[in-house]
Amino acid sequence: SNGKESYSSAEKEESGQPLQSASISASSSVESAELAESANAGYPTLKEVAQNYNGCALEYPNMEELSVGMLYGDSGNRYCLFDVDGRVHHVFESDTYIASGFYNGMCMTSTRVMAKEDGTLFRPSYLSNDEIIIRYAKDDDGTLLWTVRREDSIEGTKAIITAWDTNGEIRFQCDTTRDEFSKMNSDTVYKDLANNDYDSIGISQAFAYCGGSVYRIRSDFYYVFMNIDTEKFFSVREPNAYLIQAEGNLMIRTMPGLRALDDDFNELPEWEAIKSRRSETPVLSEGLIYLDVRRDADDFEDYPSGFYDVHLNQVIDLSQYNIQSIYEDEPRFINGYAVLQMKNPEGVPFWGVIKRDGTWAAEPQKGSVRYVYQTAEGVLITTCEENIEQWYTYDQTGTKLDEWDRIKFDGSYGYAQDSSSGNRGICEVYNGYTYASLNSHVAKISSDGSYEYLS
């Protein structure tokens, strides 16, 4: 039968069943993979469903439970939920916009309500009516649902910000009566958070995740950063941008000016008067950061191009190379490998892969890198020859993958973020495979570069 028929019959069967029997939630213990497989067998495959569409993309991966995909159609796009075997559990109506990954039996829609596996819209029972959902994501501290509500009294208005864990217990809570919020207007904070733009990672975003256990609130020109593990807060007024990246218990500030911070958000003294020679934003990854900086103080000091730790100790010297960003993405380590885009003295582009010990995993070769994707053991690098649409894909050793000729990743150029970064991850490494969008299909890719399409 064609995909349409089998799908609609599966939909009819599914609608007659209670939700529990139709699905196995990730939290229940599955005795065996066969049991899960048989429970999912009633669902149509992504390949069957995608036949009626022009293509499919991975939007919010969570292969452990269900992933959010996007089906592209002439009459509009539709979100869907599918499992690791590529079976489609639900296709949403075209007017439903999914704005988070699917965790613990639910995902968030753009109208600030949650959707179940069968598409039912609901609000978690532990939320009072005046709580507005502002973020739902799986971050380093686990899956958290963030809300804001306001309390008005004759003394004044306050906004209360709460993070709920998957049991509906309060994991973290604070309100705008804290000193750090004293320069902000509580009414404005509430309105900014209630209208938070959930899927952008822009400077003006009212509520943002910075990595690690650090979150940020922005209102007017004030920022409040909070570490929900240490319960430490930090506030600052900055008319431009104030950006912090956290990795584990390490933090760097990338704007205004480059600094490393301690657990209390104090600047580390060794970063005093440091100025970058590059316009791109560096990235702290696997404890190292690529820098080309100088100290503009009485004792002028040079920190040439290379990888450094957060105390400005140079780990790898790259000063003999002309290091380029990859579409504004600076070099970073992924699985112990850093992909470097370089130019020779005549301006010809070369790329190579360096290991943490500073030796080459892949010697420099000609080409311009377009994509870098994480695999279970290394990275995949897609290059494109200048002026001709000829795509090549390599592993971290520089070995060309012949079966990848003329196919490429979908999405914007640069480094693909694993979904664990809390941002809109466009790939996920799960059980030894990378799941990503490839040539308008959802693909399952192994570390050796072999792949299969799920859609």
Sequence positions of predicted segments:
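Gram-positive cell-envelope targeting signals
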Residues: 1-27, 31-34, 38
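Residue-level detector of conserved, function-critical positions
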Residues: 37-455
